[in-house]
Amino acid sequence: MKKLEICVPATTANLGPGFDCLGLALDIFNVAVVSWREGVRLTPDQLYEWAKKQPFEQQAIAAAYSYYASQQTVDLPLIDIDFTCDIPIARGLGSSATCAIAGLMAGQYIHQGSCDKEELLKLTTDLEGHPDNAAPAILGGLVLSAGNETGPVTVNLPCHENIHTFLMIPDFELSTGEARAVLPEFIPHREAVKQLAAFGFLLQGLARGSHDLLRQGNLDFLHEPYRRQLLPEYDTIKKRLLDCGCSVVSLSGAGPTILGLFAGSADEADQLAPLIVRELPSGWELKRVQINHSGLRQFCF
């Protein structure tokens, strides 16, 4: 029996004004160990039916595996999936993207014997509908991405070692569909101009590790003014994080997790955590998480 271990990091997307195009990989992982035997292989249609019968916690990985078979028009063996989920589900930390990547990676490796990250990113984007979580999860670090008719386009951007991340994770879920439903179709032109400026300041602040530049980038008109109504405690938590010294506070992806970016030394970041939790609303957990620079990792044994 052959085995493949696939480690996929969590991601935080948007980072405020980088709506649907900016993402950052984090050192929290979902790990899938996939086992299979060579021999009998199933058609894509058979794999699709098999995937629907898998346990809930493995179903997304199995579905992505069958999707790979259908997209490549190949027969693949059945797989056993041992899944360790350390990324909170439906919290805006890219958990669905990790499952899609794991299933597609399994199919790609069994089919080709290697990992082609460019192809993997295209397939994941096709399956997920957008690359803002998939790109940093696969490539690691801070990634700017966009989708076009030929597939996703990405670029890794510099992120200073003085940038530290804090996650405020609630004990409730928020579906991406619900968060998308509250967004307007249009925003005023003057707000779009301010958004562009904030995005530029955000990128420069991340590259230079500058608190002042990041504060200028702590602005969004595309999603947070509308999604905050789904989180009654958002304003309270955002004020707390800013008062404690965070440079940027934003929803992580579609929420409900709230991201705080701090520009300073590691010692200063260590001192920040006790201040934040001192007046934390009930039902919220603080996690200080390192930035992940390696992205997707796989081991065959």
Regions found by a protein language model. Give the residues of each.
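Alpha/beta catalytic cores of group-transfer enzymes, especially the acyltransferase/condensing modules
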Residues: 115-162, 249, 255
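DPxDG-like acidic metal-binding loop motif
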Residues: 28, 93-115, 138-143
